[in-house]
Amino acid sequence: EKERMKELVRKLNEAAKAYYQEDREIMSNLEYDTLYEELQALEEKTGVTLAGSPTTKVGYEAMDELPKEAHESPMLSLDKTKDVEVMRSFIGDHKTLLSWKMDGLTVVLTYHGGTLVKAVTRGNGIIGEVVTNNAKVFENIPLKIPYQGELILRGEAIIRYSDFEKINEEIEDVDAKYKNPRNLCSGSVRQLNNEITAKRHVHFMAFSLVSAPGQDFGNSRIRQMEWLKEQGFEVVEYKVVTRDSLDEAMKYFSEKIETNDFPSDGLVALYDDIAYGESLGTTAKFPRNAFAFKWADEQKETTLLEIEWSPSRTGLINPVAVFEPVELEGTSVSRASVHNIS
């Protein structure tokens, strides 16, 4: 089991490095989540967490090409589930905001004296990359706002499917086309030349207000979101729910996902009561005032071509299924680890 854990840590970290540092995907979200959950289960079973395990750290180191900067408050990942009942028990009797979990690149904006002064990517949650010049050419970001204090907010930079398709149509080389809007967005936001960013039609969807001294929001996240709209920001669409109205809201979101022009990979539940949510604190990795819901894994039928036996670094021989390529979450998949031949 320890050897399998070492192998999982290595594979997951390689995938994270490729994704966060090199803007490329070497495994699909689905495969990453499956391996991650296997590692979590083994860690729980053995009581051991290896150094470097992705279950105890977030993201990867930012690259050196753009200036780096530490976030004023660390950006933790969200705990997540695919089970609606887990979401229901999290929500309980609390008034909760249920919103899209946007699938792009998280960016933190700072305004001073009504002017955008800084934009920093999420990076590894502790240190991000400064992309202020690029943020200034996002399609819908307000460069000036009425509020004159120091405003810090978080949101997701995204590229809409319609824009993604137009950009891909202009690329003649099939191999050079982008696999999905998230990859294109990540590369666009982290450009060294913001003229390129400007051509990519990046949108910013605000999802969290970090601080706005002097403003009274009546201890309500809803009031914060409405205030951000008044300042000129486009905010992520949300519904206010309790456990009793959760099913109706889930139905609304699940039906709308089919026609959305923006990429999302689930939903986020956040308590409206700011003081209560903050009083819960955090675990080593997750805040306790929010929870993410992931849609059921995308499934595709394909044809198994052969089974290969792949020796791991530890000497174990693992079966690998080779099949006709299928698109899963925007990534072409043609191989997958299997547990046994039967």
Indicate where each model-derived feature is located.
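RNA/tRNA-interacting regions in translation and RNA-turnover enzymes
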Residues: E1-S342
